[in-house]
């Protein structure tokens, strides 16, 4: 069974508080989302395997540790997920980046996929899907479906805020996938927004309405 983990590090919670504020401007919102993602990847990558590597220091030869095995692919769900990519790449600069494009029907709240672009050999890669919000869970579930259909076997989902309804739906659909969030919020309102949430992350990241 995949785990659901809230990352409650003080720095993450501090920056999350900043972006919850409706008066947080686009520039600061974008910067904090990037920084939160960078802080979160420390925990998300905790179980990545290491291998011994021989290096020569200025003093002598030494056996050191480096990431081994599967190559990482960061997969933002367009468009809001893009805001989390650079923070992860700061710590895993060799990661590849795939993209999944989805939009949500404002009446039914159901997601619709319109674009998927991935590297080859997903079965040999560690996939990290990123999206600031886990609301109904529909987009996240569909994103995992798309990756599994293309052969991915090792998948993690990372978000900033999650609603209990979305977590429940996601875990029922994909019990093998770990979920990491900076917060578990209270509930979804009738418009499908997370409460208290942080509004429309895509609009706030890109200065649109």
Curated annotation (Swiss-Prot):
DNA repair as UniProt keyword: no
Disulfide cross-links: none
Pfam families named in the record: UPRTase
InterPro entries (UniProt xref): PRibTrfase_dom, PRTase-like, Upp_B, UPRTase/APRTase, Ura_phspho_trans
Catalytic activity entry: UMP + diphosphate = 5-phospho-alpha-D-ribose 1-diphosphate + uracil
Assigned keywords, A-Z: Allosteric enzyme, Glycosyltransferase, GTP-binding, Magnesium, Nucleotide-binding, Transferase
Residues binding uracil, per UniProt: 194, 199-201
EC number from the UniProt entry: 2.4.2.9
SUPFAM superfamilies: PRTase-like
GO BP term, example: uracil salvage
Nucleotide-binding is among the record's keywords: yes
Main EC class the enzyme belongs to: transferase
Gene Ontology molecular-function annotations: GTP binding; magnesium ion binding; uracil phosphoribosyltransferase activity
Notes on how activity is controlled: Allosterically activated by GTP.
Stated role: Catalyzes the conversion of uracil and 5-phospho-alpha-D-ribose 1-diphosphate (PRPP) to UMP and diphosphate.
Name of the protein this chain belongs to: Uracil phosphoribosyltransferase
Natural source organism: Ligilactobacillus salivarius (strain UCC118) (Lactobacillus salivarius)
Gene symbol of the encoding locus: upp
